[in-house]
Amino acid sequence: MLHIKFLKLKNHYVRIFMSVLFLAMFISNSAFCGQVITDEARQWAKQALAQEHTIQQTDGKKTIAVLNFENKTGMAELNPLQKGLAFMLITDLSTVRDLHVVERVKMQALMEEMGLGQSGLVESGDTPETGRLLGAKWIVGGDILALAQAPLYIHSSLLDVPDEQVLGQPTAEGILDNFFEIEKTLLFNIIDLLKVELTQEERIRLERPLSLNTKALLDLFKAIDASDEGNYEQAEQYYKSAIKKDAQLTAAEANLMELQSLDFASTRANESLQLLQAVRDQTSLTDTTVPGLTTKRNLIPEGNRIPITLDVPVPAL
């Protein structure tokens, strides 16, 4: 009995350590500079637009920007997936050593400065210029659809910014309850198109889901959106709700700790740790995905690349 209690206590502190480590990644890694759009990010966006005509495309650096996806299902309850899917892809792609990923807050600040509103949805004709402003070699975005044969169908386009060519249109489909599988399918399709060679360690790490709990993920996505709108108290509540639903969701923990570090949250850090302890003592989740993910690909041969319009054919609704 004493041994079991010791293991529980040990696991508790290990999880707290992992949460702090995840927050440190947000600070140290350029793609993890936090999820709060700061005055510095908005100032950068203003300067980028002011220098729009003088910005030169950087060569040689494998930089990718992930745009918000557009919900075209007609179901407003799926709107959190617009930023949520982009957040998940950015989180995963940022762990690939051969890639540099544009920070989500930088992308969001630029979208708002361009007058695209909180949704940050980019028209197809503006995509190449957006990529140049973000200093990206590649840019990916797309639509969230609902089809007869697939409750959720993700149709995206990967653009080579300097050449203004579509490299391919990776897709993924599934049900909302298995949204983590949909994101992983899309992720590996994008990586294949980029012709990035993954190490075995990277592949194993990328296969781990952010969360198996879709309700927790939706709360995380709602929190990010509320934070973008400057509604930090609501964001705090959504982060707490996400943590209660999935005590292993370190992204929600890190984002909540960021709000606290910036004095945007009403909850103190020690109160948050008490919350984590309470839910983790009652929670046990796996960190592996369900085997047998279905991969959907629609690759375009290098010699047959099409000019960029991003108005690519989409299966009939």
Give the role of each language-model region:
Residues 38, 53-127, 139-148, 167-168, ...:
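Short beta-strand->alpha-helix linker/helix-N-cap micro-motif
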Residues 43-51, 108-113, 117-217:
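Catalytic-center loop of serine/cysteine hydrolases
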Residues 17-29:
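Bacterial N-terminal signal peptides
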Residues 34-60, 183-222, 229, 248-307, ...:
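Pro/Ala/Gly-rich low-complexity, hydrophilic intrinsically disordered segments
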